[in-house]
Amino acid sequence: MKLRSTALVKGFRQSAPYVNAHSGKTVVIMLGGEAIADPNFANIVNDIALLNSLGLQIVVVYGARPQISHLLTSQGYTTPYHKGIRVTDARALELVKQAAGQLQLDITARFSMGLNNTPMAGAQINVISGNFIIAQPLGIDDGIDYYHTGRIRRIDIDGIQRQLNQHSIVLLGPVASSVTGECFNLTSEEVATQLAIRLKADKLIGFCSEQGVIDLDGEVASEMLPNEAETALQRLIEAQEDDCGTARFLRGAVSACRAGVPRSHLISYKEDGALIQELFSLDGIGTQIVMASAEKVRGAGIDDIGGILDLIYPLEQEGILVRRSREQLEQEIEQFTIIERDGLIIACAALYPFPDEKIAEMACVAVHPDFRDGDRGVILLNRLRQQAKEQRLKHVFVLTTRSVHWFLEQGFIESDVEQLPMAKKALYNFQRRSKILVLAV
């Protein structure tokens, strides 16, 4: 008898909305030399190939900093850095080209694998590299001549887009030529960032040794706005870690975000499957830098009824919430406020006003179990209090059997049935014996 894995089926079904959401989207992936040297790199290539098969348009930008440094050291040669950028003289340039060229061949070979019983079986991926980027010299800064270190002059966006439209993966490295036929050493951060901006990419993805950006509590920050990412970058600079992979990515991510790239993701190159977990699960695994929060608080509409029913059904089954039918929700949908994340309703609450008695009921408060550690309940409470104020009401009340302490922590006080509005008092269920809690608006 064949073994059946319900976990596989469940995971596949849960990922379906993300497969649909990401299909056809443009993603720029920045692979530093550290990621390429890690034993997990083969799995990263497999995961990128999977993204390609799912219809994502992918540009891979690889760096070669540790490989270049190793090659220079093996030749007994060192190069100075100025403002975190390598000064590349003529001798160093030859070694840079050697290291970058070797990596290009190795990465292309990885994507070309097609052995049976491997994740690459039948993939048949076309990897395209070329002179899509034209460079120019970085010049002299503070009296320091960068020689053959350069920056981007222009990018052939149309040429890259043609390759992406043909379902090819575009692979670009840290060496580009100029209009004079010279070669220049570029930073992979600049290449990836500028590509993401000019391609109007949907995502910029980078890899570091950690799971993402580590906050002051030692935890992975799941989401950051650009100003928060800048603060994290400043902490790294003050700790003299401004040359680490996280710092280099954050610089690019902040620039990309402010130039219109909706999301940048930072994940670990050591974690097997991090790329898939980040893109195809509700809360991801790393850190994303976003133009605006991925969560939106808004009034509910008819199209949200299915999502609200899915959210509250488990709580109704446990007896925590009173059951609401689809028909009832359709009639009352304008009373609901929701928190939405990536198209999924993760929290809801409703406000039912009794204007004659200057009071309103806060009801059907529910938060998705994966997001109960945050302050989403408080966010909904504050939004509903504001709505009550705007309606010139003086109090809100709740009926609850399980969440008494949480409401008390938010400033509610216990009351009794006599304090309920007349219409609600007539419907009070004495068998359920819900606690009545009231809060001044």
Swiss-Prot record:
Keyword Transferase: yes
EC number from the UniProt entry: 2.3.1.1
InterPro entries associated with the record: AceGlu_kinase-like_sf, Acyl_CoA_acyltransferase, Asp/Glu/Uridylate_kinase, GNAT_dom, NAGS_kin, NH2A_AcTrfase
GO molecular function: L-glutamate N-acetyltransferase activity
Localization annotation: Cytoplasm
SUPFAM superfamilies, per the entry: Acyl-CoA N-acyltransferases (Nat), Carbamate kinase-like
Boundaries of every N-acetyltransferase domain copy: 295-434
Pfam families: AA_kinase, Acetyltransf_1
The keyword Amino-acid biosynthesis appears for this protein: yes
Keywords linked to the UniProt accession: Acyltransferase, Amino-acid biosynthesis, Arginine biosynthesis, Cytoplasm, Transferase
Pathway(s) served: Amino-acid biosynthesis; L-arginine biosynthesis; N(2)-acetyl-L-ornithine from L-glutamate: step 1/4
Stated family: Belongs to the acetyltransferase family. ArgA subfamily.
Protein's name in the database: Amino-acid acetyltransferase
Species annotation: Photobacterium profundum (strain SS9)
